[in-house]
Amino acid sequence: MKEYYAARAKEYDQIYAKPERQVDLRLIEQWLPARFENARVLEIAAGTGYWTQFIAPVASNVLGLDASAETLQIAQARPNNESVQWLVGDAYALPAPVEPYDAAFAGFWFSHVPLARQKEFLLGLNKTLRSGARVVMLDNLYVEGNSTPLTEPDPEGNTYQVRTLADGSTHRVLKNYPNEFDLCELVAPFGEQATYTTWQYYWAFEYVLR
């Protein structure tokens, strides 16, 4: 996965240029910032910083973490991201903060987490947050005829896509599509105020840490 996103870094933002998704993107760009006003935010899988640029202007401060140095180089160059701190790191081994964060955001990351590691990831994330912190995840809905087709699931139930980059290389990428019930069940032991929001091509899920 790390190698795939490093190779894809320069062409990653092409996904935000798809004509049919522009209405959704404008709506989400307006919806997202209010979740992070005046908050100390940890962003997981910050990537090229596309979503960071909408969070940073309203947040108290943001730490954007990603496994790929190549994507973070692009993130640093965005106009609204000058004050953001960036860190190359592992989403499954998050650094302990000096002070717990007020909020966390994971955009287009949770769908890449293997089913067997979803609980592990969330518990690790929660350790970096204060009680009452808000967690927001944003990701893709599977839209027949528009989304990249899925291959057969593996023995654990994970699904995959075969993606081709501009250089012609092909990559088998884990891509799961959790539903509202799956997400609510996962966070029930430690989260409250769970909210699931959908647009035509995307979903968002929020919870507040107890």
Pin down the residues of each PLM region.
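C-terminal alpha-helical "lid/dimerization" subdomain adjacent to the S-adenosyl-L-methionine
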Residues: 138-189
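Class I SAM-dependent methyltransferase SAM/SAH-binding core
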Residues: 48-93
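Conserved class I S-adenosyl-L-methionine
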Residues: 1-36, 39-45
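Core SAM-dependent methyltransferase catalytic element
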Residues: 192-210
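A short glycine-rich, Lys/Arg-flanked "PGG" loop and its adjoining helix->strand segment in the class I
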Residues: 119-131
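A short SAM/SAH-binding and catalytic strip from SAM-dependent methyltransferases
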Residues: 103-117
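A short acidic, Gly/Pro-enriched loop at the edge of an enzyme's catalytic core
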Residues: 96-104
